[in-house]
Swiss-Prot record, chains A, B, C, D:
It catalyses: 5-(methylsulfanyl)-D-ribulose 1-phosphate = 5-methylsulfanyl-2,3-dioxopentyl phosphate + H2O. It holds the Pfam family Aldolase_II. Catalyzes the dehydration of methylthioribulose-1-phosphate (MTRu-1-P) into 2,3-diketo-5-methylthiopentyl-1-phosphate (DK-MTP-1-P). Keywords: Amino-acid biosynthesis, Cytoplasm, Lyase, Metal-binding, Methionine biosynthesis, Zinc. The active site is at residue 153. It is an enzyme of class 4 (lyase). It is found in: Cytoplasm. It comes from Neurospora crassa (strain ATCC 24698 / 74-OR23-1A / CBS 708.71 / DSM 1257 / FGSC 987). This is Methylthioribulose-1-phosphate dehydratase. It comes from the Eukaryota. One of its GO terms (molecular function) is methylthioribulose 1-phosphate dehydratase activity. Binds 1 zinc ion per subunit. The gene is mde-1.
Length: 258, 258, 258, 258
């Protein structure tokens, strides 16, 4: 067989992951994942991160120890080539590392890149994210599909939404949709895309009993929103333990300036 | 236009942030912020730190990843030049980094420098600070404006107050005022200044659902008081979870020596 | 006497622990233990790790500070020579470090190597493991001998069992047997072996009020399963504090694909 | 005046703190304190550590940031010279750093060295130690003066007592006396010494609402016992939150071997 995939795998385009620039995606993904490991976000090979640079998408492989990843471990995929693929489940890798399998998170990362034009997508298994979805579960169907919190300063760390300028305000209510987990991570894709359609301004989707996907225009925005969200999830769990509500009705004490 | 600001921005005084001394403010702010990031104080670009050296004030920009800051990212401002500005909200920067915006915390840091002659001011979004203000909120208006704790050894980490020598004693009650958060961080300034007037001896002000501002005569004192305060906030939350009161009436068992 | 043991101890085979390869077991055990110390798994000389490479078993000594261990501190033992020993409690070391005693965990590590053909075995004193056994203890005899959790994504981090390919699924229930602690760690061995016989697919055994033993085909698998398990133990304790059950009956929302 | 103190201060014996050996006390105290800072044991200049080498005692100064200490900051004192001093509160320093004051912990460290022949003494302000003393306080006078825990493996990390060989067993009950805090740290000395007399086998004394002092024959033993104790304090607080008792009556399941 002589498909582009096979050809590319043969000469394998190793130059795509070789750079002395610490901000090159192939260097940045391992550095980010090592940092995320210390935060408990990518424990035991769970979770991960992907970066898009124009048409190219850089992806960590399946099942690696995230704090030990190397640039040589990174997959590279072309969005344009992928779009031309007849089978949506078939990936067209420009570069594949030896001895690895692609991550099951790949179609979820691609959804953020193609539907939201994101430059980076992070997936964590953070305890706080999982606990928030478990706490919501006890509130009965209907109320359990949305995490809401307001009147916390850290909410300002979020943009107003895709294609909108500016960030949320202190009195705004941050809403993060929750989707149910599926037996196979790839099967989450359609539910993630549905949530993106229903919540066009969200930069994150919680996955019940699993974790969270967070994306942003670039690495900086995806990472800082992921940190802010994890902060809010942790705070929400601690508030629950102290019997404090996540949403309150506080009147602005000072008129909001434009 | 030919104002000093524009002139200064043109030649930009980069020498003000270039030093091989690790204790130079332009080197120290990034080092401190990297350390604070590991403590969870400046998650997701929240929080920050500012240092004053005689007339010059060194400030981190808005929206940066605090653990990745570099000396080149630092703003420098002259207190004397600022005092002559007709518009209090207009900042007169001697040096501005490219591609950044000044931090909204700037007027709050300046309040500590001008009203308290502080040499350093730290602003954290620590969970423990936020949780303490949330717990106080449940105690009803009137009781919710002051964090109080006594009979804990770590209280000795605080000075007696601005212009006074010596530290608090074990049996003294540490009181930290709480101000309400505002939609825009700059609008906090007048409330912070009010709290400084009402509590002339305090080295810190809590901001409801937001975090804490802590200052001191120099970096050493601001940092160690901020650590001691965060320790006490964490202890207070843990005491609350265990049903233990923050203020107790313990008689000294040994006569206090002078 | 002129036994192989004595001979080997005399010339002591130091070459067995000298390698410039960071993945050599004598280098890897100290690096792993330093990492585990930061996770709170091997506090105060407790816990440890052992690696098997073909016939050779590499072991940390008793009572060392795990974050300060050096390759020179490592014991080496031959499984073949050990199998020929008449006294099962007598160890036949090819290489012994000066000034140390062998670890009491040795026979437990050997059980994982000989009965499960493991390539690595990790023993932690993690708080979360101990707390899980304490919580189970309150559920009465009969129910206290097995930790069970299901419908959490991280469960997928576990293999289906010794000699089976593939990992557990999201809806599978992870079961970890609990054995009672004994006054002497060596006396745990027979109970650990019994649990291995009763739970042929398990990769871990909890020890009541003590910690956990986790093994795997190689270092990668043992370490990532140990991380996943610690994540689940922590989650289980947090779920208990929030009144959430560890085992739930959730129907798959999407047909499971083969 | 021409006392030995003054003389020694003049030539100041800087050689006593200058060594290229990382295990020299003047190098080891800063390294240990930096590690303890990351554990939350010496937050905000609280806590510290002292090492004795034969007649010489090495001490950190008062009020320093413990993670930034340098060998040049260390005080050195002679036990023999100290013993000849007429005023017990007067310290006879062989070497004093410039611009510092001696630590108020000094007489407490000296008590461990002179009354227990310790080689190292560590003082932490760990949250867990403070919380344990607060929890005990709620149990009423009489029951509040002793922390007790048993049937936890980590108890084996403690020696049987001063001058005795071997460690505690799994079924032994670890008992740590609690003394009341005093307004001045130096005033704790007599109560610490009383507790040492009443509990001749203990290697630690808790100080109510303050922290813990832990000592050992050498640095290794003091540090690992301090780690084990902090582990047990943390576990005890977590057990309290889960409603689990610290002391239980478990019969050995296997006959204890000699």
């Amino acid at each position: 067989m002589c498909s582009p995939t096979t050809e590319n795998n043969n000469n394998n385009n190793d130059h795509l992951v070789q750079s002395s620039d610490p901000n090159h995606p192939a260097n940045l993904i391992p550095a980010l994942c090592a940092k995320f490991w210390t935060l408990g976000w990518v424990t035991g090979t769970g979770g991960g991160a992907s970066i898009r640079s124009d048409d190219l998408v850089y992806l960590a492989p399946s099942g690696v120890q995230k704090e030990l990843m190397k640039p040589d471990d990174i997959y590279v995929l072309s969005l344009a080539a992928q779009a031309q693929s007849l089978d949506k489940r078939q990936r067209v890798y420009l570069r594949s590392p030896a001895n690895y399998k692609p991550s099951q998170c790949t179609p979820l990362f691609l959804a953020a890149f193609t539907k939201r034009n994101a430059g980076c997508c992070i997936h964590t298994h953070s305890h706080w994210a999982v606990l928030v979805t478990l706490i919501l579960e006890t509130q009965g169907a209907g109320k359990d599909r949305e995490f809401m919190i307001n009147n916390i300063e850290q909410i300002k760390g979020f943009g107003k939404g895709f294609g909108k300028s500016g960030n949320l305000g202190y009195h705004d209510t941050l809403k993060i949709p929750v989707i149910e987990n599926t037996a196979h991570e790839e099967d989450l894709t359609e539910f993630l895309e549905e949530a993106m359609d229903k919540y066009p301004d969200t930069y994150a989707v919680l996955v019940r009993r699993h974790g969270v996907y967070v994306w942003g225009e670039n690495v900086h925005k995806a990472k800082t929103m992921c940190e802010s969200l994890d902060y809010l999830f942790q705070l929400a769990v601690e508030m629950k333990q102290l019997g404090l509500p996540w949403v309150t009705d506080i009147e602005p004490t000072v008129p909001t300036r434009k």
